A protein has these predicted regions:
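Cysteine-rich micro-motifs
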Residues: 3-13
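A positional "C-terminalness" feature that preferentially activates on distal terminal regions of long
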Residues: 27-35
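Short hydrophobic/aromatic beta-strand or adjacent loop that forms the aromatic wall/cage
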Residues: 90, 204-208
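Short amphipathic alpha-helix that is part of the acyltransferase structural core
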Residues: 35-83
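Short, charge-rich patches within N-terminal targeting peptides
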Residues: 16-19
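Conserved beta-hairpin
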Residues: 89-105
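Acyl-donor binding region in acyl/amide transferases
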Residues: 56-59, 104, 108-205
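Flexible, glycine-/basic-rich loop-and-beta segments that form/coincide
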Residues: 216-219
Length: 219
């Protein structure tokens, strides 16, 4: 399927998976990975949602979120689950209707946390990918609900951030969700003389959008 996606691009011990569960996710087809009950329906749900209000926003296993991102994200499909769980904080969400996923989101501690003043108390939307059959306004509704969940359940997080790929996006989703543009960063490679990284999926300029949850962590 052609899909809509954006650049975005919490440590949950209860979300750990066994080796068998991880292998099951890896072996699912693109259709099955959308379905919360693939063994019963093989990816065939009921009616499609006609409004974003019909979607329920739920946490999900990181492996499933990464698999859906691979299927849906047109710009940044590659993100391995091990690069998510090694962070101090991370959490993943799905937007579902009738147990079928229509969007996925992956949050973690910022990739450039050491360069940010609030790096230790910030959370970055690393990836957000939306299927082309998702209803209008899915992204803004999902971002709004995820923001409320994170603020309520993770009192040490003070700031949310995400990077917009300027080559393909105009930041409309962030503007509609009440975020503000904090800075514009020139696209650069993470590879340097001392460390070789995988080839970048994009080297375009990025705008960092932010949303403040609170002024200081709640202890």
């Amino acid at each position: 399927r052609q899909t809509r996606s954006c650049m975005c691009g919490l440590s949950q011990g209860s979300h750990s998976q066994s080796k068998e569960e991880k292998q099951t996710v890896n072996n699912l087809s693109a259709g099955d990975v959308r379905d919360s009950m693939p063994l019963f329906r093989s990816g065939c749900g009921g009616l499609s949602p006609t409004s974003a209000l019909h979607l329920s926003i739920n946490r999900c296993k990181v492996q499933r979120a990464c698999k859906l991102n691979e299927v849906w994200h047109s710009r940044f499909p590659k993100i391995h689950w091990s690069n998510v769980v090694r962070n101090r904080d991370y959490v993943c969400f799905l937007a579902e209707y009738d147990d079928i996923a229509y969007a996925s989101a992956i949050w973690s501690s910022p990739v450039a946390a050491n360069r940010l003043k609030e790096g230790k108390t910030a959370l970055e939307l690393r990836r957000m990918a939306i299927s082309d059959d998702a209803p209008k306004n899915t992204a803004s509704r999902m971002i709004g609900i995820m923001r409320k969940i994170i603020k309520k359940e993770f009192p040490h997080i003070t700031l949310l951030l995400s990077y917009q790929d300027t080559d393909v996006h105009e930041g409309t989703i962030y503007k509609a969700s009440g975020w503000y543009p904090a800075s514009k960063n020139k696209g650069t490679s993470w590879t340097n003389n001392s460390r070789q990284r995988n080839k970048e999926q994009s080297l375009s300029d990025k705008i960092r959008w932010e949303f403040r949850l609170r002024d200081s962590p709640i202890k």
